[in-house]
Amino acid sequence: MVPLFITSDSALTYSPLPEPPPTPALGGQRGPPTCQCPDFPYPVPPSEGCPSGRLLLSLHWDWGRGAGGSWSGGAWPGSPGWRLARGPAHGASAESLGPLGKALVTGWEGGWRGGQGGACSPWYFPIPAAL
């Protein structure tokens, strides 16, 4: 499980960060997306989410394709780096996350549908119950 820390401005940081994934092949091709959930440690199609049924966030490596890319219309920064996204099929929004509302919690669906714009190996972890 990736440790989660919340700073005073609701930004999320992780320690330690995983190593960046290898550079994708030309054209951004990649295999079928799967997810890993600590409570159910088997690959799961992103459309199904994790079987635990809890709201989950995931950490992605974004190759920084810039505005107009597959990440929610290019809303994320254009530089490579780890990005946060919420899991699909949970019906959550940034506003519903309370103290996490300022976090980058959008962009998941576009990334999976487009097959580009980020790595296909997210790390899932449950939001602490105290939040």
UniProtKB/Swiss-Prot annotation:
Residues 13-32 are annotated as: Disordered. This is Putative uncharacterized protein FLJ26174. It comes from Homo sapiens.
